[in-house]
């Protein structure tokens, strides 16, 4: 019975697999319903999508988006019954290629890429609408041959509408007051022609006056030019008979606190430098004594008399030369000045052929000092905790990505946040990746250092800057983290790499204390000296005057023989001045000291509690005698040793690295031929234990 059932089931299965299943006929009296086809929800034109494409500069996607929604209408904020019609280069109301080239070349004094995004219809008039590479929206009036800057972005364009367009105001006034006689078209055309000719002449005169200032590539060059050409008058395109008189902050009476107040009024909080102030033919002018300032990104601002806020005038100096002070009276009209022949400018200044340097905009977010510091020490805030978690992330599963991916994601998410460092005071790291700061160095630049070659993969986390100052990517120290969790600092100005810490905790506790160049700063006063370095040597000013005179340095050490001072740094080490006679109690015997004296090494004292003899070489460098003839260089000068001296004994390793093809002498590098065993995966680690810990351990035993 079971076999018969199995056979039937097998036959049924074979028959069903060979022939397709037959559908049952519909029941009598029941009609079969047609199957509904699934359809997608129709897409609707969205202004946010259009603005996002313009911000990302995805012009190919913008062209497809405009073609897909061609003919869609959006009501503008002003005036009523004013409609924006979506359309691109293939719309029926589009411009010709000749008209588009005319708009791109003949209005700004230089070529500016414009992309057609549609038209605006008001009454019986149509205005073509463009967007440039920075997101600004322009409208073209073909009747008067002029451009109007409607808004700085698309969101402002949809909110403000055509409120900056003069013909729209004139048409509304003509409709409300029909009895007012209009200007004859021929007379109006003649006025427009004269206006264009006047604008072209005034622009050429202003461009000739600003040609040397436009050749300055960065803020430092502009500051030097203003300092060298004080009281020089640069003619403006508008108002007429007005000029910019170059003056420094001291001439204008601008203090550092006032410049910081100006900086806080900006959205980006970028550093600003004064260019001068406006002077007219008559003192009784609205623009008299208006101060002009330039930001670190090249943006030009105006400071009105009696106000603490800055007004943005132009995106860069070349744009300021084109518009002058017209934005102060809400004049956003661009006359057609035609193509500018720069042959005369090239003869006067050949460097003008170089393009104006466009610096990347870096936005910094600085919290208040009370939320950053607690009793003079940086708080371990939530941003620090998030950085620690991303720094020390481990892979719990073998298929999960490496820990550097989490660190990169966190740095990109918190780009622009400023975190205070333990040292130096009021210095911190601004988080961000290389794209955020515009760091475009080749990896070969970093692979020239042996410590970075052995570090494996490197991750960029930010730049070091002073509080409320945006770092300069060309000169600011760069902070890198290796795959092992070690922190490095690359200084472009010195072309050196410093090892800041072997872990996140060591980096947070020490800050930039391993960067030796900070300890060779010039002497300022006792207050700054105590706040920065925390030593007790009172004669630092006299010592700074004789750093390169070895005889006087030895005389100072002999005059202070027997006196004890506290060295800088967190380990409480004491240095005692003295000669080799009093150093006999140390482990270094007379024979070793005699051999070192023949090599021009002189004993200047010893350190406690490590009880190590300190020597000065023939060039003024400071060395410490560890054991036998093992010497370690601690500093380049006696001043740097007093300021930093005890730091090496807490973290005994090599800190400073020069390129492999360089023969420069670096601090904290063993100078003897003794080879110490490797205690770590990296070459820059000298010992796995701290000398201070070993000394305290033997003392306790």
UniProtKB/Swiss-Prot annotation:
One GO CC term on file: host cell cytoplasm
Pfam families: US22 (PF02393)
InterPro entries, sorted: US22-like (IPR003360)
Keywords: Early protein, Host cytoplasm, Host nucleus, Virion
Region annotation (Disordered) ranges: 1-33
Cellular compartments annotated: Virion; Host nucleus; Host cytoplasm
Family statement drawn from the similarity comment of this UniProt entry: Belongs to the herpesviridae US22 family.
Role this protein plays: Contributes to activation of immediate-early gene expression.
Protein name per Swiss-Prot or TrEMBL: Protein UL29/UL28
Lineage, top ranks: Viruses, Duplodnaviria, Heunggongvirae, Peploviricota, Herviviricetes
Gene this protein is translated from: UL29
């Amino acid at each position: 019975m079971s076999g018969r059932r199995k056979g039937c089931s097998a036959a049924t299965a074979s028959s069903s697999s060979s022939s397709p299943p037959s559908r049952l006929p519909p029941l009598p009296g029941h009609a079969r319903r047609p199957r509904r086809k699934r359809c997608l929800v129709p897409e609707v034109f969205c202004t946010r999508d259009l603005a996002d494409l313009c911000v990302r500069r995805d012009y190919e996607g913008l062209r497809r988006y405009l073609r897909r929604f061609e003919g869609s209408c959006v009501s503008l904020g002003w005036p009523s019954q004013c409609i924006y019609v979506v359309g691109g280069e293939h719309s029926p109301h589009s411009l010709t290629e000749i008209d588009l080239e005319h708009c791109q070349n003949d209005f700004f004094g230089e070529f500016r890429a414009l992309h057609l995004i549609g038209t605006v219809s008001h009454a019986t008039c149509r205005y073509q609408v463009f967007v440039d590479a920075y997101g600004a929206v322009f409208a073209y009036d073909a009747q008067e041959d002029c451009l109007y800057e409607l808004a700085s972005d698309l969101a402002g364009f949809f909110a403000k509408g055509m409120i900056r367009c003069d013909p729209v105001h004139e048409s509304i006034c003509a409709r409300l007051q029909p009895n007012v006689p209009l200007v004859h078209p021929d007379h109006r055309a003649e006025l427009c022609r004269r206006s264009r000719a006047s604008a072209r002449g005034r622009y050429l005169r202003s461009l000739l006056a600003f040609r040397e200032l436009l050749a300055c590539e960065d803020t430092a060059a502009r500051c030097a030019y203003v300092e060298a050409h004080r009281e020089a008058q640069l003619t403006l395109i508008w108002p007429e008979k007005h000029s910019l008189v170059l003056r420094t902050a001291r001439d204008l009476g601008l203090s550092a606190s006032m410049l910081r107040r100006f900086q806080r009024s900006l959205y980006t909080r970028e550093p600003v430098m004064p260019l001068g102030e406006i002077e007219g033919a008559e003192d009784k002018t609205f623009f008299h004594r208006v101060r002009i300032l330039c930001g670190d990104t090249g943006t030009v601002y105006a400071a009105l008399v009696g106000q603490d806020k800055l007004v943005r005038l132009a995106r860069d100096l070349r744009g300021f030369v084109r518009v002058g002070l017209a934005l102060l009276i809400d004049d956003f009209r661009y006359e057609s000045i035609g193509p500018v022949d720069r042959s005369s400018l090239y003869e006067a200044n050949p460097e003008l052929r170089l393009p104006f340097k466009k610096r990347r905009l870096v936005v910094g977010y600085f919290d208040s000092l009370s939320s950053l510091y607690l009793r003079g020490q940086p708080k371990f805030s939530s941003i620090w905790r998030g950085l620690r978690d991303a720094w020390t992330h481990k892979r719990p599963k073998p298929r999960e990505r490496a820990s550097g991916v989490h660190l990169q994601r966190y740095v990109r998410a918190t780009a622009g946040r400023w975190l205070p460092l333990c040292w130096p005071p009021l210095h911190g790291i601004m988080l961000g990746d290389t794209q955020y700061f515009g760091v475009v160095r080749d990896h070969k630049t970093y692979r020239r250092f042996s410590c970075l070659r052995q570090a494996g993969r490197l991750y960029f986390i930010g730049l070091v800057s002073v509080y409320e100052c945006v770092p300069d990517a060309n000169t600011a120290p760069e902070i890198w983290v290796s795959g092992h969790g070690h922190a490095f600092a690359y200084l472009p100005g010195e072309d050196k790499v410093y090892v800041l810490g072997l872990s996140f905790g060591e980096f947070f506790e020490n800050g930039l204390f391993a960067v030796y160049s900070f300890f060779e700063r010039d002497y300022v006063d006792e207050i700054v000296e105590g706040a920065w370095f925390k030593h007790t040597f009172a004669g630092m000013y006299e010592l700074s005057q004789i750093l390169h005179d070895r005889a006087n340095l030895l005389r100072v050490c002999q005059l202070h023989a027997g006196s004890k001072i506290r060295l800088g740094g967190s380990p409480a080490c004491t240095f005692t001045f003295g000669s080799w006679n009093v150093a006999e109690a140390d482990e270094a015997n007379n024979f070793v000291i005699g051999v070192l004296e023949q090599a021009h090494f002189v004993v200047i004292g010893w350190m406690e509690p490590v009880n190590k003899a300190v020597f000065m070489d023939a060039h003024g460098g400071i060395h410490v005698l560890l054991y036998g003839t093992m010497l370690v260089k601690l500093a380049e000068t006696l001043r740097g040793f007093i300021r930093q001296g005890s730091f090496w004994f807490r973290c005994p390793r090599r800190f400073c690295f020069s390129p492999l093809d360089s023969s420069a002498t670096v601090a904290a590098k063993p100078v003897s031929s003794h080879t110490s065993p490797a205690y770590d995966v990296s070459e820059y680690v000298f010992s796995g234990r701290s000398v201070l810990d070993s000394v305290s351990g033997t003392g306790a035993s």
